[in-house]
């Protein structure tokens, strides 16, 4: 293929001059061939500026790059290994192993830029996916082949919730999973690897990491690398779980290079192509008639503001949203899911059944009423409430505590063994509280337990 030379380097953005008749296409991968510390560095063409010059984003650090260095055009987009050989391995954005376990040796390599499945190939799913987490199964149930977002500010438990979901679903589901770590802490990636190893599900997970310390080009593309691997499993007729932690960093990486690529910033300094970049990724995460991709994405919410353009753009693509709240975390209730702010398209009597629907709505009604009464209680005290309202408050406080649950992955912090609660048990428990069957039990008994039977046992000890 044709060769060119570097004419300009600004951070992660590199301009390369090629002969006029051999200009690389947009998204072609270029490789540095000159000797030096950056030999073998891959860059992706983003723009053709004219005069044979193309503007690229470096997929690795641009330290040591110099003008005049020679670059070769590979003639195709970045290709990554796909298929069964990727399971149990940790790879980077280019699909190269970073776990020191030798080459991947996959039979097939796919380019990371692909078309989304056409309308006629897509399938709509209504089968529920049980997670074993009470608040999620009750209020915002997941669909098999659906998209879920875990929204939360810094430190409210997105990654811990994600780990628990992987632990519960990957074990019970016994399907294949792909984990894309996009711009998160290296330590979390390390913890995740050993967590999977200890629970013997490592041979069912492919891991792709582009951590916080990587250049923006790397973080911008690593989500596509993970998605491509998941698509291969789906097209083989399997049901895949795709975990992305964190989708906000994908947007952020786009923001970092956007200005360097010469684009005018839009609202809050985000890239003007925010919606399109998000759409390109999200439209590919879909289920077809051959197999399904169920995706669970952590979404960092900057400054706890859900109206920020990045989380707001993500909302549009999801079937279920699990919103984590700092106020609930402050009460010591974990998982800190806000039952009044979390939604699901599946919460429909035609999908989940009448009993589940009425229980979930009943729980939300009681909690909403309690929220309204809080102001009165703060000013006048509990004694000023009517008998009915006092009962609502008592039940709401029990429900709040019953929505908490000890996690398997958090045993080290809580000291209590994790609990998996079936959907049937969850509905039975909350229905009982709403019907007043447990009005005589103290509210402490409802905190950090699994099923309602454990509440009764705990109450005897209090």
Curated annotation (Swiss-Prot):
Gene Ontology MF, one: ATP binding
GO cellular component: plasma membrane; proton-transporting ATP synthase complex
Enzyme class of the recorded protein, top EC level: translocase
Reactions catalysed, as given in the entry: ATP + H2O + 4 H(+)(in) = ADP + phosphate + 5 H(+)(out)
E.C. numbers: 7.1.2.2
Segments traversing the membrane: none
Function, as annotated: Produces ATP from ADP in the presence of a proton gradient across the membrane. The catalytic sites are hosted primarily by the beta subunits.
Record-given protein name: ATP synthase subunit beta
Upper lineage: Bacteria, Pseudomonadati, Pseudomonadota, Gammaproteobacteria, Aeromonadales
